[in-house]
């Protein structure tokens, strides 16, 4: 009986070490899943912001349908249209709308170091009846190094102004 006990000395310690290794691998897996869920949540938040920005400018286009191509031609610079005492025509209001919209996109969406924020564009197709606007919001996912292929996301929404 004593011979049997001598052969088993230290065996329970080996069992504990193996269990500890298995638990460690499991905990690392859980931590990896947690990090991925955080990244997915952040990407989802940016997509939501992009859709909200596109919907906002789509509503502005529908509210000002006579501005026509002014929305697509806007540079994004402030024209001072809404300053006290100024009268704004439809084209000037469109320029101001795009200025505000680009500011919001730059502040709420991530971009590359060169852009400083997300990029937004409005396309205008007057070859179809009624004319069609295409709103595009794009951004780069943060936390990606230059060596990796930085994923770029684009949300495009067609808008019929009438």
Regions found by a protein language model. Give the residues of each.
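Aliphatic-rich helix starts adjacent to a transmembrane/signal segment
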Residues: 2-55
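Flexible, low-complexity segments enriched in proline/glycine/serine and punctuated by aromatic residues
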Residues: 39-45, 52-162
